C-alpha cells in the first residue's frame, strides 16, 4: 500500500518572492523641492522607502527609477546607506507608464512577481508588503486599498454637483502594487505604445481585461505630495516610536 506523504505531514509552503520597482522620477513641483531627498526622521525620504523593501525577506532585488540627472546622486546615497538589494538605478520616462515599464524591464531575469511602489510612500510597512505579495501570488495582480471616508460627489463641466457616489463602492488605492511579471510587462508595453491615460499601474492591467484583487491597506502609508504631508509623516513616525 502506498501512502501519500502530503496527507501525513503538513508541508510548509515557501513564501513567494518578488522583484521591486521603486518609481522616484517625478518632478515634485507641488512639494516645492525634491521630496526624495528631503529629510524624514533623520533619513532621506527615498532611503526610508528603500529600507522597507531591503528589510523584507520576500524581496529579492530592487530597481530604482529616477530622473536622469539624479542617477549618480541617488546611487551614491544608496551605497552610503548600504541598500544592498538595489541592483540598478535607471532613468525614467515622460509618463508614469514609461517609468514603470523601464523599471520592470530592468528587474532580474526569472522574476515571477514584480511589485511597483511610489518612492514618495516612505512609511510602507513590511506587513503590508508581504500581504500584497501573497495575494498577488494567488491571483496574479493585487493592490492595497483603504476605504473612502469622505462624502463623494459627481460634478459636471461647470463644477455643479450632479449626484452622489456610494462610498461602499469606492476605495483609495495605494502601493506597492504587485503583479505577475509577464502580465505587467505586457500591460505597460501596451499602455506606452497606445498612449493610454493610466494614473497607476493596475490601470494598465485592468485595461487588458485582468482582474486585480485587493488587500487591506494602511492609513499610515501616505504619499508625500504637499509640504503638509511631511508634517503628517513626521507625526506618524513619532507615533510608531521612530
Sequence positions of predicted segments:
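Conserved alpha/beta core of the MobA/IspD/sugar-nucleotide pyrophosphorylase nucleotidyltransferase superfamily
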Residues: 2-16, 171-242
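N-terminal glycine-rich phosphate-binding loop and ensuing alpha1 helix
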Residues: 10-71
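Residue-level signal for inorganic ion chemistry
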Residues: 22, 46, 103, 117-118, ...
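Short aromatic/basic micro-patch
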Residues: 39, 123, 164, 178, ...
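Acidic helix N-cap motif at the loop->helix transition within catalytic regions
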Residues: 72-77
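Conserved donor nucleotide-binding strand/loop of the catalytic core
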Residues: 81-94
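Conserved beta-loop-beta/alpha segment of the NTase-like Rossmann-fold superfamily
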Residues: 94-157, 174
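Short, flexible, basic/aromatic active-site loop/helix in glycosyltransferases
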Residues: 153-179
